[in-house]
Swiss-Prot record:
One of its GO terms (biological process) is thiamine diphosphate biosynthetic process. This is Thiazole synthase. Homotetramer. Forms heterodimers with either ThiH or ThiS. The keyword Transferase applies. Its EC number is 2.8.1.10. The active site is at residue 95. Catalyzes the rearrangement of 1-deoxy-D-xylulose 5-phosphate (DXP) to produce the thiazole phosphate moiety of thiamine. Sulfur is provided by the thiocarboxylate moiety of the carrier protein ThiS. In vitro, sulfur can be provided by H(2)S.
């Protein structure tokens, strides 16, 4: 069981809502993935009605909705979006995303830390999307973030865990859940993140852009479960040289 703030999750696979061909496919894929936490960009909402074509189905699906601040370019804009989410969706949970560069969508560490500090002071449950920077993760933890969400590689790139050496450090040091977010493009990559000891992964593009999103959601669910089980079982140590798997009895010397 994964606990973030006061909420418990059975599934350690979190999903997104973008890039699906239809809301029907999206909902079916989410069900197939067994995900219990789904993130959605506030910029997709019609501010006049407080809705879009996927919000109502999501609210009725039983998943926990995690609004995000995608599109915010600085702390001020992100805080505004978080306050809007609390008013419209009646939630104090927010996925904090600040990426001023629209080409590479790299998260701004300075603005993210500033926004996180203020939002935590206002009582939000803040889950910041950030570079895989162990120092920044520690600072975000210190200001009160409920979890940290370091990237595996650029958003939507499907490049996998390009930041693995830094993810290992973050996981080792963290006192809050570590959710690997962005760039996970295959179930094997999600499995690897869980083997490292990540508490959860967030996957969107790899599922939504699949030829069969429903089946792919199921594949990711199985991969995350297997990776977590492998981590708990304890992986064998990696060696640079061969190690005998059978005892040396010397029986050949007796011939």
């Amino acid at each position: 069981m994964l606990k973030i703030a006061e909420h418990e999750f059975h599934s350690r696979l979190f999903t997104g809502t973008g890039k699906f061909s239809s809301s029907k496919t999206m909902l079916a894929a989410i069900r197939g993935s067994e995900s219990e936490l789904v993130t959605m960009a506030m910029k997709r909402l019609d501010l006049k009605t407080g809705s879009d074509d996927i919000l109502s189905p999501l609210l009725h699906s039983g998943v926990k909705l995690l609004p995000n601040t995608a599109g915010a370019r600085n702390a001020k804009e992100a805080i505004f979006v978080a306050e809007l989410a609390r008013e419209v969706l009646n939630t104090n949970w927010i996925k904090l995303e600040i990426h001023p560069d629209p080409k590479y969508l790299m998260p701004d560490p300075i603005e993210t830390l500033e926004a996180a500090r203020e939002l935590c002071e206002k009582g939000y449950v803040v889950l910041p999307y950030i570079h895989a920077d162990p120092v920044l993760c520690r600072r975000l933890e210190e200001v009160g973030c409920a979890a940290v969400m370091p990237l595996g590689s650029p958003i939507g790139s499907n490049q996998g865990l390009a930041t693995e050496p830094f993810l290992k450090i973050i996981i080792e040091q963290a006192n809050v859940p570590v959710i690997v977010d962005a760039g996970i493009g295959a179930p094997s990559q999600a499995l690897r993140a869980m083997e490292l000891g990540a508490d959860a992964v967030l996957v969107n593009t790899a599922i939504a852009s699949s030829a069969d999103p429903i089946a792919m959601g199921q594949c990711f669910a199985q991969a995350v479960q297997t990776g977590r089980a492998a981590y708990l079982a304890g992986l064998g140590q990696v060696s640079q040289q061969a190690i005998n798997t059978s005892p040396l009895t010397g029986f050949l010397n007796d011939q």
